């Protein structure tokens, strides 16, 4: 039995889950949800969410604040005064499980950050390393934010899918960081950000014509300097 089987999902309660553009478009497509139904921006002035991994985005309505694009949180139905991932499905606590058991409501479409936890690729990029999980995901003493009920073991991880997931996660986050560099040169309103994402990813597949295409402002030829151009392009 894996660590998640009887867990209350402390990780899904403790952390703001960073998204990539691919995560966002997959959730929109597969679950038929709109961006505004599941995505939000989390202010991250000290880098505690990005952790030198997810990119920071700047927006014209608050240009001094670095934000990370994440899944929304909502109030827990059973653990008063705590929050959880918007997609976490909770069961009521019982005698065997004082904090209940919880499951991901979008497991097949879950973001790359969720697929990767608590793993990483080694320095060669060929092997999976299990990271040590701390006892708690947030400061304080609320048991809702306690993490895995036992240490992870290699037998808990699928040796095929884990490597594949981690390689894709690394690639998509790298692409998203480059996308953030382009966006941050001319930050626009948060309100047009999903249109920008759809525009970029719609142009992600190209027919090769001579020299390779560099990922810069020219990669998104319709990306103008004002919000109206973004809306019309998308």
Question: Can you name each region flagged by the protein language model?
Answer:
Residues 1-234:
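Short loop/turn segments that flank or connect secondary-structure elements
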């Amino acid at each position: 039995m894996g660590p998640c089987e009887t867990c209350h999902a402390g990780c899904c309660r403790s952390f703001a889950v960073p998204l990539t553009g691919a995560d966002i478009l997959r959730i929109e497509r597969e679950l038929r949800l709109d961006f505004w139904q599941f995505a939000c921006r989390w202010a991250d002035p000290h880098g505690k969410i990005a952790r030198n991994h997810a990119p920071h985005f700047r927006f014209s309505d608050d240009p001094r604040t670095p934000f990370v694009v994440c899944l929304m949180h909502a109030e827990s139905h059973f653990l008063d005064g705590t929050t959880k991932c918007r997609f976490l499905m909770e069961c009521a606590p019982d005698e065997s499980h004082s904090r209940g058991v919880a499951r991901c409501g979008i497991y097949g479409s879950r973001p790359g950050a969720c697929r990767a936890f608590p793993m990483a690729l080694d320095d060669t990029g060929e092997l999976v390393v299990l990271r040590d999980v701390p006892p708690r995901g947030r400061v304080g003493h609320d048991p809702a934010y306690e993490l895995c009920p036992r240490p992870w073991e290699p037998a808990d991880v699928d040796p095929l899918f884990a490597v594949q997931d981690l390689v894709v996660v690394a690639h998509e986050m790298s692409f998203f960081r480059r996308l953030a560099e382009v966006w941050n040169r001319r930050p626009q309103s948060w309100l047009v950000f999903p249109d920008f994402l759809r525009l970029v990813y719609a142009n992600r597949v190209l027919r090769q014509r001579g020299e390779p295409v560099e990922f810069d402002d020219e990669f998104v030829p319709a990306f103008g300097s004002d919000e109206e151009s973004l809306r019309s392009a998308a």
